[in-house]
Amino acid sequence: MITKLQAWSAGAIEMALLLAAAAVPVFVNFYGFHVFDLGKNAVVVSLALAVAVIGLVALIEGAGSGSLLGLTRALRRPLVAAAGLLALTTALATATSITPRLSLLGSQERAQGLVALLAVLALFGAAAWLARDEARRGRIVGMLLAGSVPVALYAVTQALGLEVVPGKVESASRVFGTIANPIFLGAYLMLLWPLALARVWQAVRDDRPVLFAGYAAVALLQLAALLLAGSRGPLFGLVAGLVVLVMAGGLASGRHGVAWGALGLVVAGAIFLALFNVPNSPLAPLRGAPVIGRFGRISETSSGSEAARLRIWRSVGRLLAGRPARLATGHGPEALKYALIPYAETYVAGRGQAGRLVDRSHNVLLDALAMTGILGALALLSVYGAWLWSAAVAAGLAPTAPDRRRLAMLLAAGTGLGASSWLAAPLYAGALTLLGLVAGLIVYFAWALVAGASRPSDAPADSQESSTDATRRLALALLAVGAAAVVEAAFGIQTVVTQVVFWMLAGVVVAVGAGDRIAAAVSDRAPAGVPRQRSRRSREHAAEPEPGGVTITWSAGGAALGMVAGAVLGLIVNDFVLYGTGLLADTLTVVVLLGLAALAAGWLVATDVGESRVAFLIVALIVFGLYVTLRVATWVAAQDASWVYAATVLWLVALVPVGGWWLRGAAAPNAPLGQGAVGILYPLLAIPAGVLVWVLAIQPVRADIYFQSAGANFDAAVKTDDATLFNVAEELFGRATRLNPREDVYYLLWGERYTRVGTAAADVTVAAPAFDKAQKMVAQAETLDPLMPYHTFNRGHLQLLFAQKLEAGSKQSIDAAANAAVALQQVFDKVPYDPQVANELALAKLVAGDSQGAIKLLEYSREQLDARNGQTYRLLGQAYYATDQTDKALEALQKAVAPGTSLAKQERFQVQLMLAEIARERGDLDTAIDHYEQLLAGGAGDWRILFNLGLVYRDKGNFEKSLAALSQTLQAAPDDASVRAQIQQALDSVLAKQGRGAIPGGGGGLP
């Protein structure tokens, strides 16, 4: 007999799935240093732990009703087995990782360790179990779509230039919504668009104009945001998914002409793309057009993102070839940036990446090979292949055993053919292997078209496929999603949000392939609020009022959907209405728009699945009000954003058991509460789960919030010279490091702040303590992460900065520079491809007096690393000038400021100043004057430039301009007696020249 606890478990797990579907994409933590994936993953892990604990309860409660037998049968399904294989290979890679802790917990930037994978696999298992029930499946897919609405709408507001929160953005030209990056936003929406189309088509079939209008609006909004993101990988994936959808739909419905047309479009599209990339083709003018123009630059592999991606792929290829012993298990999840360092090339893993070292190869298969080895890569391919096979079978495209074998063989053959490119074109093999998998699917469709076989509309009675038209249409959409995901994986990166969507939909694929349950495995009847044994269409109309009257209905399912919508409304407020930060002009407008859109999307889903819209709306507003009250109370009590975050996550977890009550399956009236004495142990399961939520999800993000707040206070203290703010910053930094003591980046960035303080100090005695503090911070970062050579680089860098603060040529300065050179040489030995490290080492040699060593190193950097690096030419000019090689110095300095080189404004000033000095020494006074005047016009306010300009005008005989420049110098010069005496001497010499002709006068110029 089904116990009441077992029935509740199913509802609670569904509630966790609905929250993950709708809340994770919209959640943003602007309080933290890592705004996006760290906080999102914390929510996923928290909900997944709830799923795991409640699932264990359900398994124990159902031990006597065949649950274990059902679990055994589920493991035999291809996609479930592939997911299990992926978990095992990832666990093995983590156990043998070069960075075990990082591989287990994930990085702060990506949050994609073993824990994150197990979390999304828990959601996968839950979806596979529950989505066999049509009502539950409808709610899960519906909330995935509803969750995309505020995300896509926020992206549109970004395109309109509406500012909601202050701070930096990932992309100023392309939208990114709440998903961190335009590429990631595009991939997320790509996964959902075929499902939106399926709902639109279902509304047409059911003659439901309200649903048609609603889902059409959702699809258009998603498409608009996807196009505004402008990322080619997701667009390629979407096109591939649509081609598969049309071909499969044509086959499934017997409209072979439609399928042939889709195949023809594939050929035409390939021809168009080829012509679009031919230089000087008639299509060339289109390359300047928005969105589509980027597809005309695919062949430009010498610059832009194409060149960067190919550099990464080459580097990963060298890594795989250079460490064959690691091919079995890989280097560990999240370990690519460490493994890649010895095998990278210029501007791949170099310091020039400014702290964002390449940690992904922009190809999911290459990531798997490098991080989880061949076993992990095979597991990944098996997941993709099993998805396509299972969805095609569920859609009725392979109804017989021979068809299924043929489909499996063609999928394997396409993958194998793509993989064979490792022998002929290894640079593109990762992409071609994935594309080959989809090609195998299309070849199967082509075979079916040539064979002329019409797919039967009804599956055999003993098959595992769904027997309803609506379910088959969903299977077709899921097949398109799978194809899109595989194509995008050839060029993209996995993220927290895309992983959540991918694995939840993978669970739906398993459920659809298994067929709808006549009697739910956890229930004697349908879930609460959904009438049993009613058709989808009749259920959809159940909530509509009868003609001539108004009927107010209540359903538990509608209330549960309202809870999810209320949670999303609360998160929108949490995202953009920040304590301690004033509202921008557009904040409230955007928040209201997003809230209304989220509410409308939830209402649409409630209408679609036949739940009460009244219950939905009432509960949504109540839950929203309760959360706002909780948030305000937490802030008033703690005055601490980290506790607001903690309260938010715990609030989401607390909604799970409450929603489970509304979504519970039915038990017999006389059913027991539980299985007896074993139920006493259930509350004990919550203790380790709660500890894990606190340790894995809440504490790291609280630390991140404290660190961000510490940085803001530190910067404000430096700007205002406020000792109180400085003490607050130090106290907050201490909290951050106590909560997350293993995060080396905190120490690194704190050291960089002290380095800036020391560099800006006017006096060495003030600078020395700051540099000493910075040295300690960087040393701690080195201790925590000894595999990262750029911590050593930062140690050498700050030593060099301190050397430059000391008196030039002094023993102390030379010794400090020599120490810096030792550290920088250690780094350069590990990354000889990095121009910035080479330049920094060369500068250390220059300051230490080793000009010839600096020249040799800089010439190597120019000839072997980057022939257009402005820093290299600037330092070469300085080194040549120091060794009296004036002609070479002049040539190098001119190249340093040539078009196409990148130098900071202050560095360009330094180059122009050296060019002016060289021209002056050579007697080319006009050129010297031009350089000095350009410096002054560009904003260089150094009094020494005015002084030297005055002397050049004097030497040229332009005494009026000389007097003007020297008079301004006297006003701008520091209050130093010797300096002012030298300026006055120069003025006297000009006055003497005006009165008596050529009279020897002072003023030799200041360097």
Predicted segment positions?
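Soluble catalytic regions of membrane-associated enzymes that act on cell-envelope
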Residues: 321, 694-883, 894
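Register position in tetratricopeptide repeats
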Residues: 756, 801, 847, 882, ...
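Hydrophobic alpha-helical transmembrane segments in integral membrane proteins
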Residues: 275-289, 574-579, 632-642, 663-720, ...
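TM-adjacent membrane-interface loops and short helices in multi-pass inner/ER membrane proteins
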Residues: 181, 301, 308-358, 365, ...
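Flexible juxtamembrane loops connecting transmembrane helices in multi-pass membrane enzymes
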Residues: 174-175, 238-242, 261, 272-327, ...
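Helix-start (N-cap) detector for alpha-helical repeat units in TPR-like alpha-solenoids
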Residues: 233, 703, 744-745, 789-790, ...
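TPR/TPR-like (Sel1-like) alpha-helical repeat modules
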Residues: 894-899, 954, 959-977
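Alpha-helical transmembrane segments of multi-pass inner-membrane proteins
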Residues: 1-27, 44-58, 83-100, 113-284, ...
